[in-house]
Amino acid sequence: MLSFLPKTPSLMQEELKVKFRAKRKALKLTQEELSIKSGVSLGSLKRFESSGQISLESLLKVALVLECLGDFEGVCQQREEMPESIEDLI
């Protein structure tokens, strides 16, 4: 059965840490290299990849280096209203 409930913050945190680690590895960057390029401390990167904990500023700096900063542009954008019926589409 499909669930339309939003993900929990904990689940989102878990998914983000996994995706960011995978992206770092795909770009063949070590944690140390990412730390230097992003200006985020090595300790912060290690904590993020293990627990998902990171400041928003650091997350965005890492996203810039990992070429996914643009993915954050759609966050909290107002969505268009969905039609209530097929007649509303016509």
Question: What is each of the regions a protein language model found here?
Answer:
Residues L2, E73-I90:
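Short, charged recognition helix plus adjacent turn
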Residues L2-A26:
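A short, Lys/Arg-rich alpha-helix, primarily the initiator
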Residues K28-K46:
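Short alpha-helical DNA-recognition segment
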Residues K19, T30, S55-S58:
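Residues that mark the N-terminal boundary/hinge immediately upstream of a DNA-recognition element
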Residues S51-L64:
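Short, basic-rich loop-to-helix N-cap that marks the start of a DNA-contacting helix
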